[in-house]
Amino acid sequence: MLRISVIARAEDTTITLEGRVVGPWVDELRHCWQQLRVAGRPVRVDLDGVAFIDARGRELLGEMHADRAVLVTGDVMMRAVVDEIAGRVPRPDR
């Protein structure tokens, strides 16, 4: 399950995610993000409450990052995932 909370302010919009970014929840997050893009405000994605991100979730977050969304987290493990998505560290061979 994934909880998606949106806080829109004059300067930006924050999407706060809690749970697992997997399966059908990836589609729900994509739908939410596409609606927010229309407003044209910068988007921040708060990943502090995320426990797991599957391959499709990582792909979507990569698309969001490429579209200038800022991925933020204070969690050490999630920071490694964000760095990988943002291309700051190479992805390990699997």
Language-model-detected regions and their locations in the chain:
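STAS-like cytosolic regulatory interaction modules
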Residues: 1-94
